[in-house]
């Protein structure tokens, strides 16, 4: 056993004394030592209940003959970090999480690991660590929050962000906003729509790193606790059979995950996280692959923010196994990929029935013939830009309008709330990329304000930053190269015409080449916004959003 390095033999008597100091018996020390990575904290609704799942995981490990030992990691709540300096730290926390887990698992030689994440950057950070360490491992996520209820309809956090814009536009009163505030997020779990956290938890299942049900079983369900116990038991089987993350997270598994992502209409943040996880696994996954799979994979689900349904509806409809079976039956995913069940994707999903066809449509009758995400290219984004196509209104699939240029999210949000943005405009938010931000902030507040004001049908927004999975509308992010790296977005001037064609995958600045060359001669990179601390180091080491914003 790997853990023998800290517990077996004469020279390890001091080590055993330390283990005994924590109350471990000889029998417990002799058993396989299983690290339980707990992302619990009291800041994230999606993580507030994780200690209960940790205890269930430990029970499962013990039932299967192992000794569980728990350690923590950090987690940022993107909702609480939104629209202030805290959001600069969100994406950057992903690398910290992976690094911290590496430190703990290398300093203390566990035999296997159980990862317990739930929210936005914690899931990919843990998947990166799992690939890097390549110890037998399994994931059990915290599960989705139930949707709230307001005036007879389902609501969630995205409803709250859009309500801010509705109040500003006079479409909603502050009293109505306060009433909505009390019921939009009814309890624990990752925010209820197909936002980033739930998209990534579904990706855990699609990649094969979580048991069936991991992506959609509600946080408050007894089924989630049972799933945690099963995960604790299953990690012992993975250890016994020596099945490791790199046996599971293969090129085939990543292509399957992208196909599931397209079918779900998931968050654009998968275009950052899946390539970063693949990078750790030694698998090439770029935006061209996303584009290729998008072109052949129909969108068969349309959950909030693109539609009115939430993750609980997807769970009732059959969950990710039903979605994957729908794709598998039509040759859109590869059933031979191995999973943490010890069986293949085909074994796991074959025969899974769709019980609510209004939630999971047939491949023959999809919401759209292509996937829910699209990659755009053009002179504004030669390395690519990303849009949640499934959440764009039909009238905004093609748009041409004058640029309204802002050098920060804060400037843009103030202009939107000040009613300075008019129908037809293209809002440009730059110097918010991985390096320029630094940290590639999410632009949920600006996009939600536009939607709440009713401008999502006439205004587009492009940025070298990124978006929350709760954003909707013609919100085009990850523009690469970013402004701080000298990308063309840095040279856009107020009033320039920008042409967007999402169906054709085009993003163009309509300015003559001679004028662009003149502007480039006069352009100078602005000084870094932050030079010290972790963010300063991050800004110096981070790569393009087109590469997953990994560190080099």
Swiss-Prot record:
Active site: 468 (proton acceptor)
UniProt cross-references to SUPFAM superfamilies, sorted A to Z: IlvD/EDD N-terminal domain-like, LeuD/IlvD-like
Residues that coordinate or bind Mg(2+): 78, 120-121, 442
Lineage top rank: taxon: Bacteria
Pathway: Amino-acid biosynthesis; L-isoleucine biosynthesis; L-isoleucine from 2-oxobutanoate: step 3/4; Amino-acid biosynthesis; L-valine biosynthesis; L-valine from pyruvate: step 3/4
Gene Ontology biological process: isoleucine biosynthetic process; L-valine biosynthetic process
Record-listed E.C. numbers: 4.2.1.9
Binding positions ([2Fe-2S] cluster): 119, 191
Cofactor binding, per record: Binds 1 [2Fe-2S] cluster per subunit. This cluster acts as a Lewis acid cofactor.
Needed cofactors: [2Fe-2S] cluster; Mg(2+)
PROSITE patterns: ILVD_EDD_1, ILVD_EDD_2
Record-linked Pfam families: ILV_EDD_C, ILVD_EDD_N
GO cellular component terms attached to this protein's record: cytosol
Enzyme class: lyase
One of the record's GO molecular function terms: magnesium ion binding
Subunit structure: Homodimer.
Similarity comment: Belongs to the IlvD/Edd family.
Name the record gives this protein: Dihydroxy-acid dehydratase
Phylogenetic placement of the source organism: Bacteria, Bacillati, Bacillota, Clostridia, Moorellales
């Amino acid at each position: 056993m790997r853990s023998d390095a800290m517990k077996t033999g004469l020279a390890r008597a001091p080590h055993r004394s330390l283990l005994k100091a924590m109350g471990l018996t000889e029998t417990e020390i002799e058993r396989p030592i299983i690290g339980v990575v707990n992302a619990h904290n009291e800041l994230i609704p999606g993580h507030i209940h994780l200690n209960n799942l940790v205890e269930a995981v430990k029970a499962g490990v013990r039932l299967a003959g192992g000794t569980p030992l728990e350690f923590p990691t950090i987690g940022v709540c993107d909702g609480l970090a939104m629209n202030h300096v805290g959001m600069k730290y969100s994406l950057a926390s992903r690398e910290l999480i992976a690094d911290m887990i590496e430190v703990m698992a290398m300093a203390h030689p566990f035999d296997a690991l159980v990862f317990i994440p739930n929210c936005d950057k914690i899931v990919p950070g843990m998947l990166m660590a799992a690939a890097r360490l390549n110890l037998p491992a399994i994931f059990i996520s915290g599960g989705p929050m139930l949707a709230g209820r307001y005036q007879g309809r389902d609501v969630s956090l995205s409803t709250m962000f859009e309500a801010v814009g509705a109040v500003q536009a006079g479409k909603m009163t502050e009293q109505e906003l306060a009433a909505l505030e009390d019921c939009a997020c009814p309890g624990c779990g990752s925010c209820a729509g197909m936002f980033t956290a739930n998209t990534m938890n579904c990706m855990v299942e699609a990649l094969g790193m979580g048991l069936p049900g991991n992506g959609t079983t509600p946080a408050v369900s007894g089924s989630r606790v049972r799933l945690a116990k099963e995960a604790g038991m299953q990690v012992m089987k993975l250890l016994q059979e020596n099945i490791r993350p790199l046996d599971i997270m293969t090129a085939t598994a990543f292509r399957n995950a992208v196909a599931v992502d397209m079918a779900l209409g998931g968050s654009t943040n998968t275009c950052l996280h899946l390539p970063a996880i693949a990078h750790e696994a030694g698998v090439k996954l770029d935006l061209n692959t996303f584009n290729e799979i998008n072109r052949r994979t129909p969108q068969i689900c349309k959950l909030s923010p693109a539609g009115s349904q939430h993750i609980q509806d997807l769970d009732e409809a059959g969950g990710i196994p039903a979605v994957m079976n729908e794709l598998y039956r039509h040759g859109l995913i590869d059933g031979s990929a191995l999973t943490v069940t010890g069986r293949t994707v085909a074994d796991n999903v074959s025969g899974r029935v769709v019980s609510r066809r209004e939630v999971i449509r047939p491949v023959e009758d999809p919401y759209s013939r292509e996937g829910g995400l699209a990659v755009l290219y053009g002179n504004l984004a030669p390395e690519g830009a990303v849009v949640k196509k499934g959440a764009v209104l039909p009238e905004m699939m093609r748009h041409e309008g004058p640029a309204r240029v802002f050098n920060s999210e804060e400037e843009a949000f103030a202009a939107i709330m000040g009613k300075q943005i008019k129908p037809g405009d293209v809002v440009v938010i730059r110097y918010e990329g991985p390096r320029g931000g630094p940290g590639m902030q999410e632009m949920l507040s600006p996009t939600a304000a536009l939607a709440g004001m009713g401008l999502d049908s006439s205004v587009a927004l492009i940025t070298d930053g990124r978006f929350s999975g709760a954003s909707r509308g013609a919100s085009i992010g990850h523009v690469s190269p970013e402004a701080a790296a000298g990308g063309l977005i840095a040279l856009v001037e107020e009033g320039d015409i920008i042409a967007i064609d999402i169906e054709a995958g085009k993003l163009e600045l309509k300015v003559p080449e001679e004028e662009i060359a003149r502007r480039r001669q006069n352009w100078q990179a602005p000084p870094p916004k932050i030079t010290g601390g972790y963010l300063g180091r991050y800004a110096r080491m981070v790569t393009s959003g087109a590469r997953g914003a990994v560190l080099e």
